[in-house]
């Protein structure tokens, strides 16, 4: 519903967040949003900024938004080519109580706590599952330096 999105937009205009910048791609279309999230501290994504593309369905908040990474990122739960995110919150665990901001916070949390058992990026997932966390973190840091700034 546009009213719900307008309410979220007004809240965002009145508050400033250090780790999330969230705004409509075009103020005349509240169904397309952009988010810039900062990589969480003490992770390979620290100091990176990552752009997300957010498409909001017309029956939002009853249905979740579709969110994809625009910025390339090396993470087991993010598809390397499409930017698709494997996060239950965006699929089966969605509830109308969530906002675009709270979903972005969940994505930041996913960067801190990857789920290697349900990978969209099998290479990243396999590194973690096989105990090569240093290898995973090294590649994730390299991608963050190359693309996340």
Swiss-Prot record:
Signal peptide bounds: none
Protein name: Ubiquitin-conjugating enzyme E2 pex4
Reactions mediated catalytically: S-ubiquitinyl-[E1 ubiquitin-activating enzyme]-L-cysteine + [E2 ubiquitin-conjugating enzyme]-L-cysteine = [E1 ubiquitin-activating enzyme]-L-cysteine + S-ubiquitinyl-[E2 ubiquitin-conjugating enzyme]-L-cysteine
EC numbers: 2.3.2.23
Keywords, comma-separated and alphabetical: ATP-binding, Nucleotide-binding, Peroxisome biogenesis, Transferase, Ubl conjugation pathway
Active-site positions on this chain: 86
Statement: the UniProt record of this protein carries the keyword S-adenosyl-L-methionine: no
Record CDD domains: UBCc_ScPEX4-like
Pathway: Protein modification; protein ubiquitination
Residue intervals of the UBC core domain: 1-149
Family in the record: Belongs to the ubiquitin-conjugating enzyme family.
GO BP annotations, alphabetical order: peroxisome organization; protein import into peroxisome matrix; protein polyubiquitination
The UniProt record lists the keyword Nucleotide-binding: yes
Cross-referenced PROSITE patterns: UBC_1, UBC_2
GO molecular function, one term: ubiquitin conjugating enzyme activity
Enzyme class: transferase
GO cellular component: nucleus; peroxisome
Job of this protein: Catalyzes the covalent attachment of ubiquitin to other proteins. Essential for peroxisome biogenesis.
């Amino acid at each position: 519903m546009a009213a719900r999105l307008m309410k979220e937009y007004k809240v965002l205009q009145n508050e400033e967040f250090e780790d999330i910048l969230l705004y409509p791609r075009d103020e005349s279309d509240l169904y397309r949003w952009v988010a810039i999230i900062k990589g969480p501290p003490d992770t390979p994504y620290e100091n990176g900024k990552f752009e997300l593309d957010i498409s909001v369905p017309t029956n939002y908040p009853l249905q979740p938004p579709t969110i994809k990474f625009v910025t390339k990122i090396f993470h087991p739960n993010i598809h390397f080519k499409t930017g698709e995110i494997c996060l239950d919150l965006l699929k089966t665990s969605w509830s109308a109580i969530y906002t675009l901001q709270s979903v972005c916070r969940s994505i930041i949390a996913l960067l801190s706590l990857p789920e290697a058992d349900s990978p969209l990026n099998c290479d990243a997932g396999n590194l973690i599952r096989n105990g090569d966390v240093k290898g995973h973190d090294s590649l994730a840091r390299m991608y963050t330096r190359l693309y996340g700034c």
